[in-house]
Amino acid sequence: MDPKEKKTKQEEELKVDDIQDTVEGQSQNEEATEATEPLTAEEKLEKELKEAQAQIEDQKDKYLRLSAEFDNYRKRTVKEKAELILNGGEKSIKSILPVIDDMERALTTMETATDVNAVKEGVELIYNKFLSILSQDGVKVIETKDQPLDTDYHEAIAVIPAPTEEQKGKILDCVQTGYTLNGKVIRHAKVVVGE
């Protein structure tokens, strides 16, 4: 081949390569511009819708978990309350059991005892032990001896003439002992008052 023809052929090949490069570059530029072009209104709405749906699912999941947690809490508190009602007096009952044991021993002893004073002392010990146990649970005896009548703590069931002037308006006798539990009256003392 002639050098001129060779040169022309090479130039043509170069031109073809340049054209191919240009076409490839244009298609790549078009793809890049398509990627960087702003989204259409429809595409924006679709994107916002997907984001909103994802947020809704997330909030729904949180709500369901919180609802289940609250339901479990409510069930647990109902169960605990039922147990408290059922077993609330267990501590008090357990503390009274030794008094019952002492009473059983006293009853057994009374069948064969000949000394009345010993039996009396035993019963007094049991009574004092019982009062001690009650006081540990917050139960206190309402004082009545030589006290003025206080309707918050005392219930006057009878009024009799006072033997002395000093005893007017005061309690002369206690028919039934009253008690408080942690400062609250659980039974008023039934008393006789002088007038």
Swiss-Prot record:
Biased composition (Basic and acidic residues): 1-18
Record-level GO cellular component terms: cytoplasm
Keywords for this protein: Chaperone, Cytoplasm, Stress response
Pfam families: GrpE (PF01025)
Biological process annotations from GO: protein folding
Record family assignment: Belongs to the GrpE family.
Protein name: Protein GrpE
Organism: Bacteroides fragilis (strain ATCC 25285 / DSM 2151 / CCUG 4856 / JCM 11019 / LMG 10263 / NCTC 9343 / Onslow / VPI 2553 / EN-2)
Lineage: Bacteria, Pseudomonadati, Bacteroidota, Bacteroidia, Bacteroidales
